[in-house]
């Protein structure tokens, strides 16, 4: 899973 400036939501930040 790729993490950008804002988390997509599906991944736990």
UniProtKB/Swiss-Prot annotation:
Write down the chemical reaction(s) this protein catalyses: 2 a phenolic donor + H2O2 = 2 a phenolic radical donor + 2 H2O
One Gene Ontology term from the biological process aspect of the record? hydrogen peroxide catabolic process
The residue range of the signal peptide is none
Task performed by this protein: Removal of H(2)O(2), oxidation of toxic reductants, biosynthesis and degradation of lignin, suberization, auxin catabolism, response to environmental stresses such as wounding, pathogen attack and oxidative stress. These functions might be dependent on each isozyme/isoform in each plant tissue.
What is the cofactor note? Answer: Binds 1 heme b (iron(II)-protoporphyrin IX) group per subunit.
| Key words, A-Z | Calcium, Cell wall, Heme, Hydrogen peroxide, Iron, Metal-binding, Oxidoreductase, Peroxidase, Secreted
Q: What is this protein called?
A: Peroxidase 6
Q: Which organism is it from?
A: Cycas revoluta
Instruction: Please give the cofactor(s) recorded in the UniProt entry for this protein.
Output: heme b; Ca(2+)
Membership in a protein family:
Belongs to the peroxidase family. Classical plant (class III) peroxidase subfamily.
Enzyme Commission no: 1.11.1.7
Top enzyme category: oxidoreductase
GO molecular function terms attached to this record: lactoperoxidase activity; metal ion binding
This protein's major location comes to secreted
Cell compartment(s), UniProt = Secreted; Secreted, Cell wall
GO cellular component labels: extracellular region
